[in-house]
């Protein structure tokens, strides 16, 4: 099934305007909520969508709850796991068990095994790219996985895999949830509509899983909603090139910005313009306008905002203005810098000023 790509730059209402609007439209066309599947990449986003859907007038009196809606509005991992035989998620206690079995699991002392521990991050990134451990080693930034080598990773991975599969453990990780869903024995879901929120963050196995989910949708109701310019996870397998090409000829484009001032809009457009030129995928993306909720400005007037260059983080007129805004207003701002070690200096600067 060919997807309908919805291009939505920052703050254009991808979630609360397009997705909720589509949900209401499908309900009016007599599509059953049980067969409308909306998936995102984080529990926070999925929960926000669930809560918003349950507040729709069209959903009142139908008996749905946050718990029951989890079957159709959730993360990609959770949806895949829900269609498989029960397994427990591999966690920190399991990691500690592996350390007892093999000390090299503790070569990286990091306890955040889902995001920071070098061994688990490597196998997650390799699988996210659809590569074997050896294939990924040839293309990755090896320094980011030190002190592990590919030979050590392969040895530990065998121990890790055997541990998960042992009948007394029966564990899985996030990648397993998606890969197990892709097994031919798992039937294609019987759903009428599929919406993927922030689709640009999908890695290789997730993309294959999404395609499997879309096999039985009705009347072309297969939507990828996202922003190619916000493809942040290429390091873990997302495909920016694919989404920039989709953005060059989208099914629909969300044009009205509701978050960024004109100053921020221009700053971001200048940064991303060369990419748009390369793909021929320019966005309209207008600056935000004042509305009644702002309690200032004229309703419908473009929010101008301001842009300030800071020569340093010690003393300048613009720095005084910035600090005043941070401490004495509720205004939001975009603060940009260039790489390391600027990130450390900026973080310490903000900590210093509360």
Where are the model-predicted features located?
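Conserved helicase motor core of SF1/SF2 NTP-dependent helicases
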Residues: 9-15, 20, 41-44, 200-300, ...
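P-loop NTPase Walker
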Residues: 1-89
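Glycine-rich, phosphate-binding/catalytic loops in enzymes
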Residues: 54-58, 89-90, 211-214, 239-243, ...
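Accessory N-terminal region flanking or inserted into the helicase ATPase core
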Residues: 1-9, 16-17, 35, 109-195, ...
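Conserved interdomain hinge at the start of the Helicase C-terminal
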Residues: 311-331
């Amino acid at each position: 099934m060919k997807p309908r790509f919805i291009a939505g730059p920052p703050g254009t209402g991808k979630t609360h305007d397009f997705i909720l609007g589509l949900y209401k439209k499908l309900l009016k066309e007599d599509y059953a909520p049980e067969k409308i599947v909306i998936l995102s990449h984080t529990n926070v986003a999925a929960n926000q969508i669930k809560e918003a859907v349950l507040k729709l007038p069209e959903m009142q009196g139908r008996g749905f709850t946050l718990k029951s809606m989890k079957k159709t509005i959730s993360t990609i991992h959770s949806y895949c796991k829900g269609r498989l035989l029960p397994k427990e998620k591999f966690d920190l206690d399991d990691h500690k068990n592996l350390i007892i079995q093999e000390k090299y699991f503790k070569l990286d002392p990091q306890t955040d095994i889902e995001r920071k521990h070098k061994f688990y991050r490597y196998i997650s990134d390799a699988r996210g790219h659809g590569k074997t451990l050896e294939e990924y080693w040839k293309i990755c930034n090896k320094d980011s996985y030190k002190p592990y080598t590919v030979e050590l990773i392969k040895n530990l991975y065998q121990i890790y895999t055997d541990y998960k599969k042992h009948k007394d453990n029966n564990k899985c990780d996030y990648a397993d949830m998606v890969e197990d869903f892709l097994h031919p024995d798992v039937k294609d879901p019987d759903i009428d509509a599929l919406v993927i929120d922030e689709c640009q963050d999908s890695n290789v196995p997730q993309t294959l899983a999404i395609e499997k989910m879309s096999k039985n949708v009705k009347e072309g109701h297969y939507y990828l909603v996202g922003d190619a310019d916000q493809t942040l996870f290429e390091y873990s397998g997302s495909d920016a090139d694919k989404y920039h090409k989709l953005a060059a000829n989208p099914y629909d484009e969300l044009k009205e910005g509701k978050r960024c001032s004109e100053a921020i809009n221009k700053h971001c457009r200048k940064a991303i313009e060369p990419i748009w030129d390369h793909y021929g995928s320019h966005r309209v993306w207008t600056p935000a306008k004042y509305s009644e909720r702002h309690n200032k400005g004229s309703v419908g007037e473009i929010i101008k905002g301001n842009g300030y260059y800071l020569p340093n983080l010690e003393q300048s007129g613009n720095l005084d203005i910035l600090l005043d805004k941070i401490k004495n207003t509720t205004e939001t701002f975009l603060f940009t810098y260039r790489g390391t070690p600027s990130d450390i200096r900026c973080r310490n600067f903000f900590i210093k000023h509360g």
